[in-house]
Every structure is written in C-alpha cells, then in structure tokens.
Amino acid sequence: MKVIIGLGNIGKEYEKTRHNAGFIAIDLLLEKYNYSSVKQEFNSLIYTTIINNQKVLLVKPLTFMNNSGLAVRQIINFYKINLNDLIIIHDDKDLNISRIQFKKDGSSAGHNGIKSIINNLQTQNFYRLRIGVNQVPKEWKIVDWVLSKFSDEELNLLKQSFIDKIEFINDFTNNKTFIYLMNKYN
C-alpha cells in the first residue's frame, strides 16, 4: 500500500491559499484517479484508490497545518506503513510557483506542518513533494504570505505544473526508487 498525504488547512477561508498547495494536489490526483471510497478517520479524509494494482490512500489531514503530524502518525501506525511508501505533499515558499521538487530527508525549513510530522514520527526520513508557492516578498510576513490566496494566474500555473508531473504516481506505485523519481521529475 502507498500513502500520499497533502498538507493544508481546513475551511473555506483557506481554499486557494498558498499553504493549501498539498490539498490542491490531492484534489488534482482525485480528478485523475477514481477513488472507490472516502472515509473520515484518524483526523483525516482518506480516499482509497487502486493504481497499477496497488492500493493507494490519498489523504487530507483535518488537523490544521501545524498539527498535521498527529494525523500522519495515526495513519502510519494503523496501516503499518513503511516510510518508503509515504509521500508528503506540501507548499514551499523557497521555490518558484512553477517548480515542483521531490526531496528526501532534511529539516522542516521552517514549515510548521513538516515540523509537526518530524516531531510525531521522530524522524526526518520520509519523502516529500515540495510545491513552489513563490518566495515571500520583503514587505510581507511569512504567515501572511502562506495564508494569502493565489491569483487565478498563479493557481492555474501551479495546477498545470503539478499535472505535468502527475505521472510520478505511476512510477511511485510501480515501486521505482525515490532517487529515480528525483532524477526523472526534479
């Protein structure tokens, strides 16, 4: 089984915000791959689909960004997921909006959702798909920037950039190595 978790904040007021890039990515995956069921458990919405004869959980934590690790830990523990079978999708303020990058390991780089996951899993050793949301303008505070809404042009660019790389899920479910994914899609 593979698990792909997109980070974001719940609620209408957070839709289309930079911090919800992970939720936007999960929505794009749900549009492409039919899901057989959805349930709310482990502080998350969990969508189940089959890709390449592999069960895949597409997940949106309902804990708000700063507590994402709680939901991730509950899912990992319940389903006994190997961390090599997990990808966390999140926004990255250090990447341009059209940039999507795979990463393994490393610090949170100030991202509170990733920090929560590291604290709850007690490791930095998990795969990430970073979605660029543009650098914080000098006159903005970081929190205000990541909670600001994308312009229509930015949102379309973000979605198209993700769609251009959406086939990563086929390689991931075919058990390609993460180094292969980084070399092919970064």
From Swiss-Prot:
Q: Where is this site: Stabilizes the basic form of H active site to accept a proton?
A: D91
* EC number(s) stated in the UniProt entry for this protein: 3.1.1.29
Q: Name one GO cellular component term.
A: cytoplasm
Q: Which PROSITE patterns match?
A: PEPT_TRNA_HYDROL_1 (PS01195), PEPT_TRNA_HYDROL_2 (PS01196)
- Keyword presence, Hydrolase: yes
Q: Which residues bind tRNA?
A: Y14, F64, N66, N112
> What catalytic activity does the UniProt entry give for this protein?
an N-acyl-L-alpha-aminoacyl-tRNA + H2O = an N-acyl-L-amino acid + a tRNA + H(+)
InterPro entries per record: Pept_tRNA_hydro (IPR001328), Pept_tRNA_hydro_CS (IPR018171), Pept_tRNA_hydro_sf (IPR036416)
Alphabetically sorted, this entry's keywords are: Cytoplasm, Hydrolase, RNA-binding, tRNA-binding
UniProt-listed GO biological process terms: protein quality control for misfolded or incompletely synthesized proteins; rescue of stalled ribosome
What name appears for this protein in its UniProt entry? Peptidyl-tRNA hydrolase
